[in-house]
């Protein structure tokens, strides 16, 4: 009986240990299963999208690069296929000489938060609805260094998250019919746009930055850049401006780096009092034809500025600059040491000479 009892006890112990081990293994197995996400992002099969490529980035987001597509038809064919998911983060196409037109079928049902199509020198037309599948997701659209002459600006009001629109270095002519409640950054430099209508920004209530460097602008009407309550950065360099009227520009910055105005490389001779207001960051007027720095115009501006750049202007440096020479804290805000028309440097002028000559 004793032997049987010991045998039974041993049997019970073994069974219990097996059950405990199995249960523990089951628990461990369950925990491991929980570590496997049920909705893991998967790129389309490489053979289905070639020569496009797809990669999954941090945060389970997919980026698509279609720089090597060989035709408009091939791009549309790739995006006509069924993907595991149509939700992408970025579409990138660069240095492609085969794409000429993007149509409503080019990107199929795929959606993106950013689209960057750059240096595609044969791309001339973006047709209506080309990006419409991304109307609810697109935040940044960059179409840089192509040859675009046609773009559906009038559709941008339907893009409910669009913050950044850039079509720099293209062939856009005339001011676009653009309306958006979300757009904060509009970058159009190096397009032959011409003069900007005085009411151009009334349909862009949240615009913060506008860049139209080298846009064939010859005139800015009073009020053009004063009705945008959030405008902080304005670039109008390398145009044909010869003057600015009173009330032309008013920026709305909130610190020394938030409101900047660049109007370099124009033909501006003078600035009337009240032509520019609200600049707290950097004001650049290099390579113009400014001759005078009268106190009534420039003291209010300089007192609020972080930095003032006015290199390569034919400054007369006569009695009109005495107030500036006598204000070292304002003189220090001037970038570098501009040369006067007579050859002397502005910051090297002798205050004693001006006091004797001008008082």
From Swiss-Prot:
Cysteine pairs forming cystine bridges in this chain are none
Q: Which UniProt keywords apply?
A: Leucine-rich repeat, Repeat, Secreted, Signal
Tell me the ranges holding the LRR repeats: 135-158, 160-180, 181-203, 228-251, 255-278, 280-300, 302-325, 331-356
Localisation: Secreted
Signal peptide location in the record? 1-39
Function according to Swiss-Prot or TrEMBL: Non-catalytic subunit of oplophorus-luciferin 2-monooxygenase. May stabilize the active conformation of the catalytic subunit.
Q: What further fact does the record state?
A: The shrimp has luminous glands at the base of its antennae and legs, and ejects a cloud of brightly luminescent secretion from the base of its antennae upon stimulation.
What's the subunit arrangement here? Heterotetramer of a catalytic 19 kDa and a non-catalytic 35 kDa subunit.
Record-given protein name: Oplophorus-luciferin 2-monooxygenase non-catalytic subunit
């Amino acid at each position: 009986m004793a032997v049987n009892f010991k045998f039974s006890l041993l049997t019970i112990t073994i069974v219990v240990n097996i059950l405990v081990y199995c249960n523990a293994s089951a628990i461990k197995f369950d925990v491991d299963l929980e570590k496997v996400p049920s909705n893991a992002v998967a790129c389309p099969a490489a053979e289905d999208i070639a020569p496009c490529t797809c990669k999954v980035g941090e945060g389970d987001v997919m980026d698509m690069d279609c720089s090597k597509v060989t035709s408009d038809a091939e791009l549309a064919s790739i995006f006509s296929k069924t993907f595991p998911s149509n939700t992408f983060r970025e579409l990138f196409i660069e240095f492609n000489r085969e794409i000429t037109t993007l149509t409503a079928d080019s990107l199929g049902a795929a959606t993106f938060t950013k689209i960057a199509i750059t240096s595609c020198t044969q791309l001339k037309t973006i047709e209506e609805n080309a990006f419409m599948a991304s109307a609810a997701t697109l935040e940044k659209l960059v179409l840089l260094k192509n040859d675009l002459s046609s773009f559906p600006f009038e559709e941008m009001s339907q893009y409910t998250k669009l913050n950044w629109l850039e079509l720099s270095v293209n062939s856009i002519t005339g001011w676009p019919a653009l309306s958006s409640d979300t757009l904060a950054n509009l970058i159009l430099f190096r397009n032959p746009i011409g003069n900007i209508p005085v009411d151009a920004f009334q349909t862009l209530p949240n615009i913060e930055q506008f860049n139209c460097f080298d846009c064939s602008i010859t005139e800015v009407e009073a009020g053009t850049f004063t009705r945008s309550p959030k405008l902080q950065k304005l670039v109008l360099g390398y145009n044909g401006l010869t003057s600015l009227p009173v009330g032309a520009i008013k920026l709305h910055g909130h610190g020394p780096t938030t409101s900047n105005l660049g109007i370099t490389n124009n033909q501006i001779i003078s600035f009337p009092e009240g032509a520019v207001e609200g600049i707290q960051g950097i004001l650049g007027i290099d390579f113009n034809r400014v001759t005078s720095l009268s106190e009534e115009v420039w003291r209010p501006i300089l007192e609020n500025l972080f930095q003032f750049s006015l290199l390569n202007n034919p400054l007369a440096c006569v009695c009109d600059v005495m107030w500036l020479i006598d204000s070292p804290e304002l003189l220090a805000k001037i970038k570098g040491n501009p040369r006067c028309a007579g050859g002397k440097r502005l910051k090297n002028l002798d205050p004693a000479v001006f006091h004797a000559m001008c008082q």
